[in-house]
Amino acid sequence: MAGSVFGNIFKISTWGESHGEGLGVVIDGCPAGLPLCEKDIQEQLDRRKPGQSKFTTPRKEDDEVHILSGVFEGKTTGTPISLAVYNKTQRSADYSEIANYYRPGHADYTFDEKFGFRDYRGGGRSSGRETIGRVAAGAIAMKILKELGINITAYAKEIGGIGIDYDKFDIAERDNNAFNMPDKEAAEKVKAFAESKMSVGDSIGGVIECRVTGMMTGIGNPTFEKLDANLAKAIMSIGAVKGFEIGDGFEAAKVTGKYNNDEFVMKDGRVGKLTNHSGGVLGGISDGDEIVFRAAVKPTPSISALQETVNKQGEDIEVSIKGRHDPMIVPRAVVVVEAMTALTLVDLIFDNMTARMDRVKEFYRK
C-alpha cells in the first residue's frame, strides 16, 4: 500500500492496523543529539488514548510506546527511529458481521474497490488508531520545535455546533474537561448535547483550531511546497477531517482587499503587521506572525442508530453498528492536529536550511 510516508527531509512512515499485533512509525531525518526518552513520547500518546471519558470509545488501551532504534544513552543517534505500540484489548469478534456489508461513512466500500480486499476489524488501516504513529512522531517533532522556541497549541473551537466564547477563552481550561475546549461554559453545553445524541445512538462533529507561536519568517516555498498547502495536506490526511482553512479562510471571500490586506508596520525595529487575516502565511511562506488555522471534523461514522446500506451481494439492508466507538472524535483529534502541524513545520524548516547560499557558507565556515 502506497501513501504511508509523509515528509521530504524529516520523513515518517506509519504502519499497523487497529486489530493487528501493533502499530508504530519509523522516523528518518531526525538530527543526532536530541535528548529523547519514551516518557517524552508517552505524554503525547496519553492525550489521544481511548477510554478517558464516556465521550470516547470504551476500548481500554495503555498505548505504551517502545523505542526500538535510533536512540542511545538518552539521545538520538541520527539513524532511523523506530517506535512501536502493541495492541492488547482488541475484540475482533465485534466486527465479524460487518465483513459482508459496507458501513455508511466508512472506507469499507472504497477499500474493496481499490484493493479487492480489506481488513474489516475496526477499519484496519483506516482506523483512527493509525494516528498513534503520527502522534508518536509528532512528539519528537515538537521537541525539535521547542528547541527553536516554537509552540503549537490546538483546541476544540466548536463541537456539535456549540462554539467557544473568545471573551471566556482560557487555555488552562482545555485540560479540565472531556472535550479539550478552552471555555468551561461551552464545554458544559457540549456535554448535555452530546449525551442527548448518544442516547439515540448518534454522533457529532466539530472544529479544531490550531495556533503556532514563535515561528520564524521565511519558512515554506512559493509554489508546490507552500507552508499553508503542506499544512492543508497534513491536516486533511487525518481520517476524520473534511475541511481546512487558514487565517480568515472562507470569510476572506466576503470582504474587500482593503479589509483583507494585512498592512505592514515597523515593530521593535522589525517588519510586522497591523492585522493577521493571512493567518501567518503569505505567498506560501511564513511571515513571522502567529499561524492560525482550523480543521472541520466530521461526526464519527460508527453509530448504533439504524441506517441503510448495501451488502457484498448487492442487496439493500438495514444495519446498526456494533463495537466500541467514539461518539465524537474531536477531543482526541486535537493532539493529532498538533502532531501533524509539528511534522510539517520541522520538515519545511529543515528544507529551508539550503535556501540561501550565504547561510550555507556561514554554517560551514571554519
Swiss-Prot record:
Pathway(s) where this gene product acts: Metabolic intermediate biosynthesis; chorismate biosynthesis; chorismate from D-erythrose 4-phosphate and phosphoenolpyruvate: step 7/7
Co-factor binding comment: Reduced FMN (FMNH(2)).
A Gene Ontology BP annotation from the UniProt entry: amino acid biosynthetic process
GO molecular-function term, one example from the UniProt record: FMN binding
Catalytic activity, EC: 4.2.3.5
Transmembrane regions listed in the UniProt entry: none
Coiled-coil blocks: none
Protein name: Chorismate synthase
Protein's gene: aroC
